[in-house]
Structures are given as structure tokens and as C-alpha cells.
Amino acid sequence: MWLLLITSVISTFGGAHGLFGKLGPGNPEANMNISQMITYWGYPCQEYEVVTEDGYILGVYRIPHGKNNSENIGKRPVVYLQHGLIASATNWIANLPNNSLAFMLADAGYDVWLGNSRGNTWSRKNVYYSPDSVEFWAFSFDEMAKYDLPATINFIVQKTGQEKIHYVGHSQGTTIGFIAFSTNPTLAKKIKTFYALAPVATVKYTQSPLKKISFIPTFLFKLMFGKKMFLPHTYFDDFLGTEVCSREVLDLLCSNTLFIFCGFDKKNLNVSRFDVYLGHNPAGTSVQDFLHWAQLVRSGKFQAFNWGSPSQNMLHYNQKTPPEYDVSAMTVPVAVWNGGNDILADPQDVAMLLPKLSNLLFHKEILAYNHLDFIWAMDAPQEVYNEMISMMAED
């Protein structure tokens, strides 16, 4: 409702009286696709489609080298970046090159690959089902871990000729990593080190308003949002980024709305990039994926999706209740960064996770950081990225 009010005020007074002046000229990347965003800054880009075992067609993007190190044609160490919930590969390239992890890695000599989970803007195709069908959207992060990660990682290993790669996950990108690398030993052997940013397994202590949404009964949630896509990107999101949140008077309102869901850290948000952030987010997922997270909030457990009845769970798991994931079974070396001000990956949940990581190499809690600071914070290079790149160089 407040958004409708704001847009009405802008339409009425903004043009006629010069009120609500923009913070600056718009950023062209707000209206670009992933390949265009990469090449806009002078980096090379390759685009691939990876087909999963169950037929989903995933958009995968590659930055094979940096702007100034193309002369070294030998094999480069490979890094795979996996985004979080309702997000996409654009998260890793949304800031300026010296502030975006994907570009920094490419300039540091790495072969950088960007993944997209099924159902988001860049992975909304299937060999068998149309995105208009309910069947297409019958997935959660279970399937991303079981099918998306193996398909993408195996493709990268085959394409590059590298036996092992570095894996960087943010938010749900860590979740599917924990599942895949603890349940699929063959896949786990292909990972050098797992770099987990704002890691999420249990969400027992999350303080985000999403916690309250999680207690909406499933039947009512489906009545409100349907059974297919959840929070897809729309033209209204673009409008918010270019015409609302880019206004001097309103950027604070937009940033505070973001902070309510992810935790507050005002000084680290580059409001001049709002149009890029909102030009590509949210990128969508399935209603089932969100319901899976709601289930974890209510149960306090890190478990597979509950299909709604003992008989349905028996069909999927051969047991009446969804099985819990055993993170301690993962032997991949892992480095963890979490935020003390993160209300999605709450520090208490992270504290429960850390003892279960049998091969924990490194842990750092950044007290001021919220959930999104790991991908967008202005000081992310100093707090996280430079440290990570140094660790990769020693691996």
C-alpha cells in the first residue's frame, strides 16, 4: 500500500515541481541481461544451458578471465558462485567491478562460473514441462541440491578439465551445498573448498518478518500465492528501482524496508545501485521452495520437504516423516563468514551449525553485517573477498 501511495505522489508532484530529485543518473545494468552486465565492464562472457537429470534447463555463465590477464592461456583455478533464495547470478556482478566478487575473482586469475537455480529468471525452462504448469514448480531446495548442483558442477568440471573447483555459496546457496556435499560423496570429491557466506541450515532463531509469514497455514498460503511461482521479477520491481528508490527523499524508506527483512546496516548499502538491485531482484522461485523454508522455521530442524502426509512421505522417503540432513557427514573443507546483524541467518543458528562442520577451516563473524552485505556491502572486499581470494591462492 505504501508503494502505491509513493508512486502516486511522485506522478503528481515529481515531474511538475521537481520534487523527489534522483540521486544521480540511472545505471544501465539495471536493464541488461547477465551477459550484457558482464561485457559492459569489459569482461569476457560465455553463456551455457545445463540440463538436469529431471529436465530443468539452467542458465550458467562464465567469466573465463579478467580484463587484463587474457594472455595467460593456461588452465586457471575454477570458482563456482551460487546465489541465494529468490535471487540469481546477477547478485555477484551488481556492484562496480572492484566491489563485485565475480569480477574480483576474474581479475585475480580465476575462471569464474555463475549458476542459476531452477525457477529463477534465467532458469525457467524444462524439457518436459511448461512454466505455466503446476508440475514445473513442484520443487524446493531439495531438488536444487539433488539435481541442479550435480548437473552444473559436473558440466563445469568436464568443460574446464579441472578435477576440483572452489564453491562459493550465499544464503540458500550454502543450504544446497550442505545437502549436496553431505549426501553425494562423488560430487563432494570435486570440491576443493566450500566458502559459505551467511550460511543457512536451521532457521530456528530467525527474526525476520518471514518468520511470521511462515506460520500462515499451507492451504491459506497457496490460496494467496497459488501453487506455482513465488516472487518473480516484474516491471513494477524495475519501476521501484528506477523511479522510486532512486529518489533522494525515498531511498531511506526503500533501504529500511530491505533492512526489516535482512537486518540493518545502513552505512554499507550503496543506494546509488538500487536500480540495479531491484532491476534483477527478486528473481523468483517456487511456492514449494518457500513452503519448505516455512516448514524449517516451524520445526527448527534441517530436513527434507514434508509432502503433507505420512503416505506421501513414505512414497518419497520410505518413512512417514521427512528425513533430517546430517551436515556432519560433509567432509569438504569449509570456510564460514556470518553476520552479527543478520536476522535471516541468525548468529544463534550459525552457532548450532559450526560444531557440525567436521572440516571447518575458518570462521569469521562480522558484527555489523546483515544478510545481504556479503553480496552488496561497500566494504565486502575488505571484510570478506580479499580474505577469501587469499585463502584460495593457498589452496
UniProtKB/Swiss-Prot annotation:
SUPFAM superfamilies reported for this sequence: alpha/beta-Hydrolases
Catalyzed reactions per annotation: a triacylglycerol + H2O = a diacylglycerol + a fatty acid + H(+); 1,2,3-tri-(9Z-octadecenoyl)-glycerol + H2O = 1,2-di-(9Z-octadecenoyl)-sn-glycerol + (9Z)-octadecenoate + H(+); 1,2,3-trioctanoylglycerol + H2O = 1,2-dioctanoyl-sn-glycerol + octanoate + H(+)
Residues of the signal peptide: 1-18
GO molecular-function terms, A-Z: lipase activity; malate dehydrogenase activity; triacylglycerol lipase activity
Domain of life: Eukaryota
Entry-linked Gene3D superfamilies: alpha/beta hydrolase (3.40.50.1820)
Disulfide bonds: 245-254
GO CC terms, sorted: extracellular region; intracellular membrane-bounded organelle; mitochondrion
Keywords associated with the record: Disulfide bond, Glycoprotein, Hydrolase, Lipid degradation, Lipid metabolism, Secreted, Signal
InterPro entries in UniProt: AB_hydrolase_fold (IPR029058), AB_hydrolase_lipase (IPR006693), Lipase_euk (IPR025483)
Similarity remark: Belongs to the AB hydrolase superfamily. Lipase family.
Name of the featured protein: Gastric triacylglycerol lipase
Gene: Lipf
